[in-house]
Amino acid sequence: MKGLLTRREFGTTIIGSLAALPLLAGEKSKPSVFGGTQIGAQSYTFREFKLDRMIEAMVSVGLSSIELWDGHLNPGKTSEADFKTVRKKFDDAGIKVGAYCVNFPVDSKDDYLDRGFNGALLLGTNVMTASVQKSIIPRLDQWCQKYKVKLGIHNHCFSDKWFKGDRTKEFETPNDYATALKGASEYLSINLDIGHFYAAGYDPVAYIREHHDRIVSLHLKDRDKDAEHSHRRFGQGATPIAECMQLVKKLKWPYVANIEYEPDPKDPTPAVRDAVEYLRRVLS
């Protein structure tokens, strides 16, 4: 995702009314399992869409899995009944919630952690992802063990111009992951963003090969080799998406690889459709 502030603190008004009209009967997404690999979308891709419009877009492009971002469903403002309502919306559309993304602030209260982890279970998944600072990791590991939920830590590229914080507090490098996971429970895991990893100067193919057993979510984006590491449509940048996906297929990696397309937030649907077709070809 483009910025930590954007990702962690994006307004929750886009959730819309959970009582809105459902999709028409029979409108279900086609399965998006290509070559044995489940492809989905990180809902930050559709960050300017309300929930129902996002579901419609996913059905239209043929995606059957979602990593649901807390900008679409804030655990602090969502009742258990509403979590169940949202899950039913996705179920009715043929979309499984593969992971729940909650970007826990460092000062999160215990109740907020409980609501986030319990929310994942209510959505039907035992996988979470989070863009967080290092200091909260020990607490998150405790909650992972409490709820038996695997939580993948998200990485960024902090040479990006938008970043103004202290990169030593964040996750970017292989060593950042190694330090956090050392001595942690089996539930604390990795959410590898291959585009950010490439832009930060690291080889995502080699990292997946060595650490795939600890990765529970992939974020797929195509960043280029120019000075800005610009975001491109899939297949037009320099990120080794095809190589990563072919390796994942070979390894029979059991989790979801999620498209996270950051440009065109007003309507990313055409680019996401292209990404789905690109991945279908790569994995065929």
Say what each PLM segment does.
Residues 72-74, 159-164, 226-231:
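A short acidic, helix-capping loop that chelates divalent metal ions and anchors anionic groups
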Residues 14-15, 20, 31-33, 53, ...:
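Active-site acidic/histidine proton-transfer and metal-coordination neighborhood
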